[in-house]
A protein has these predicted regions:
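Conserved N-terminal beta-strand and adjoining loop/helix that marks the start
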Residues: 1-17
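Active-site-adjacent beta-strand/loop module that shapes the phosphate/pyrophosphate-binding cleft
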Residues: 11-13, 72-92, 102-106, 118-125, ...
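Conserved Nudix-box catalytic region and its N-terminal flanking loop in Nudix hydrolases
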Residues: 15-51, 55
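A short coil-to-beta-strand element that immediately follows conserved catalytic motifs
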Residues: 60-68
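Nudix hydrolase/Nudix homology domain
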Residues: 96-145
Length: 145
């Protein structure tokens, strides 16, 4: 099972979102997502969070909260994703190799082109302060020829 982290960093009523548009082959291409990535061998979820935020944004996250766990079933892949909110950081945004970083007003997040399941867990994360777990299943039909 793959383990990942996903973080939504907040500042002045806005959330830092990543528009995935730089790689030709990218399951997230054309979608807005939070920042994060795969947990490396020997790394804790929190260590992964801090490393991925730094690599993708240039920011050093100081204050954060683990909000939930999402189990993604994507075809034959199972991904265990730990969801975070970031509240305080130092540093300046850098150019991200994954896509375009942009501060989006919190009330506009659900108007973006997100994965279907993201609408569910983002609503839950922002409406309730309690830790939660959710399972999301995606099935992609591919042409066998």
């Amino acid at each position: 099972m793959e383990r990942t982290t996903l973080c939504y960093i907040e500042k002045d009523g806005k959330v830092l979102m990543l528009y995935r548009n730089k790689k030709d082959v990218d399951i997230n291409k054309g979608k807005w997502i939070g920042v994060g990535g795969h947990v490396e061998v020997g790394e804790t979820n929190d260590e992964c969070l801090l490393r991925e935020v730094k690599e993708e944004t240039g920011l050093d996250l100081i204050e954060y909260k683990k909000c939930g766990k999402i189990i993604f079933y994507i075809d034959n892949i199972i991904e265990e994703c730990y969801l975070y909110r970031g509240f305080n950081f130092t540093g300046e945004l850098i150019t991200c190799s994954e896509g375009e970083l942009k501060w989006i007003p919190k009330e506009d997040i659900l108007k973006l082109n997100l994965w279907e399941g993201d609408y569910l867990f983002l609503n839950r994360m922002y409406e309730n302060d309690n830790y939660f777990e959710i399972e999301l299943k995606y099935i992609f039909f591919r042409n066998p020829f």
